[in-house]
């Protein structure tokens, strides 16, 4: 998760570096290590940027840790440290875990990337997994998810459910990852409801429940009857529940907070990836490299439909999810007509689709989004 705002030039550099790592994956791969043969369990650690709650970014990664422990049993001992701020505190915690003899350390926050790399240089025999990072090293791999794929599917559901033809979107910062999701949501929405539009509120914060709630209330007061968000709490879901409106959950299933309001949940799944990486250390097969996985890889999915969503809408969304998995559907693709931004400029020419490089550097709002980036 991007904890801090990244300036546009830095975003472009990040995209370039991430794509270079993807393209150079075979070259980055290191000679497989010796299989783990210690009599004691392999030690795997996870560092979290916020406290563990019942839903959200950290919850999904904690579920990944639990999946590792459940899958590998006594062969592995997992631990975690929660609520670790990015920066100096992160480096201290990561270094301490390495000194304690952990064999693999997962650091799932963008602001952990540099501290991870710094510690990794001093502990060449420890493997590091920098989740949402983009810089690799001999003992540092990176991974992220194509969250925008789930956003597109959520947009389809929202387009079917809205009655006011207005959706609201509470967003953190206008960085590429957020813009990917906002634009994909809008494209999905308008693919089934061309008259619908999206109003967005920028918070310039990732986790601020009171302001997230206020933004949701503002959007509903402006006519939005379906909401989505790219922030860190359940506040938007709670606001929709309070007002009797609908909302798309992000990160986790949030029906405990919004049992009547939830349309569906866009979730990212880390259990399979984390387990595969820990198992690779156990078997001496761990290699550095980059992964950017989506629905096809099982890293992103939608589901957990709420009670107000008709079965026909559920079936439609799940069918489109299968199309994504099979490669038959691309969120950032144009048909006979080009896709334009909300200033009228062509951003996807007719009969074409964006490359990964272009998706990673999105700096525009698609037609149908009301507002500007700042």
Predicted regions and their residues:
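Positively charged n-region of N-terminal signal peptides that target proteins for export
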Residues: 1-4
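Bacterial N-terminal signal peptides
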Residues: 9-27
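A residue-level marker of the well-folded mature domains of exported/periplasmic proteins
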Residues: 30-374
């Amino acid at each position: 998760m991007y904890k801090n705002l990244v300036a546009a030039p830095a975003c472009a550099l990040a995209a370039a570096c991430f794509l270079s790592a993807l393209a150079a994956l075979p070259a980055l791969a290191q000679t497989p290590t010796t299989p783990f043969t210690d009599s004691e369990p392999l030690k795997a650690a996870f560092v979290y940027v916020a406290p563990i709650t019942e839903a959200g970014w950290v919850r999904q990664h904690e579920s990944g840790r639990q999946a590792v422990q459940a899958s590998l049993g006594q062969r592995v001992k997992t631990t975690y440290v929660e609520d670790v701020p990015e920066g100096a505190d992160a480096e201290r915690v990561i270094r301490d875990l390495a000194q304690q003899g952990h064999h693999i350390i997962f650091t799932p926050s963008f602001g952990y990337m540099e501290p991870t790399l710094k510690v990794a240089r001093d502990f060449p025999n420890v493997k590091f997994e920098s989740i949402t990072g983009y810089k690799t090293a001999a003992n540092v791999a990176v991974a992220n998810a194509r969250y925008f794929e789930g956003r597109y599917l959520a947009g389809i559901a929202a387009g079917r459910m809205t009655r006011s033809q207005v959706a609201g979107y509470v967003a953190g910062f206008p960085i590429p990852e957020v813009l990917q999701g906002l634009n994909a949501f809008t494209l999905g929405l308008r693919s089934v409801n061309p008259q619908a539009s999206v109003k967005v509120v920028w918070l310039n914060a990732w986790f601020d429940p009171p302001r997230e709630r206020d933004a949701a209330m503002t959007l509903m007061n402006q006519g939005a009857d379906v909401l989505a968000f790219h922030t860190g709490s359940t506040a938007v879901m709670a606001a929709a529940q309070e007002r009797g409106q609908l909302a798309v959950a992000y990160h986790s299933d949030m029906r405990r907070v919004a049992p009547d309001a939830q349309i569906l949940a866009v979730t990212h799944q880390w259990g399979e990836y984390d387990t595969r990486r820990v198992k690779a250390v156990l078997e001496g097969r761990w290699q550095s490299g980059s992964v950017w996985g989506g629905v096809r890889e099982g890293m992103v999915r939608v589901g957990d439909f709420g009670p107000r969503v008709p079965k026909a809408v559920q079936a439609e969304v799940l069918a489109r999810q299968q199309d994504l998995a099979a490669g038959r559907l691309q969120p950032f693709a144009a048909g006979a007509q080009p896709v334009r931004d909300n200033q009228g400029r062509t951003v996807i020419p007719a009969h074409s689709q964006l490359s990964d490089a272009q998706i990673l550097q999105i700096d525009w709002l698609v037609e149908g989004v009301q507002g500007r980036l700042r």
